[in-house]
């Protein structure tokens, strides 16, 4: 009996040591980085919904969440690059919406809506946009944490970085703006007139 008890104690001790030296890692380390936010700006637990924005706790940036609801946040809508002065207005494609779309229009309408309680939304910089890239995502999917950004498309997303010289076929158009391709995480420069996707950002605090 004493021998069996000693073996049991030794086994338990070994398991405790193993657990200490090799702690179980979360299934998705990315999940602790993101915080779901409601339309009114209230945080949600990871399993709750619906959510309209996502807070990146590493950078302090708050991101728009794209939808399939045929409104201004619809993931299929595309935009030409325009900031009110530079660029080309109204060359995007906004389904089921009168007129065409550009990035300035999307920023203006999102701020008027006070998405997630904020009215200082803007187009992200290239560096900010690349913080969303998750290269561990399986091939064939958009390179982003889809559990928090389920509607981001495999395609080009505009940044705010502009006046960048174009090369090759587009060189005759002069300059354009940077975009990040969520198929592979690569940065490219596109003509302002091109229709690309858009995800807006603001600073949480």
Q: Where are the model-predicted features located?
A:
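Glycine-aromatic-enriched surface loops/turns that form tight recognition elements
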Residues: 2-6, 10-122, 126-205
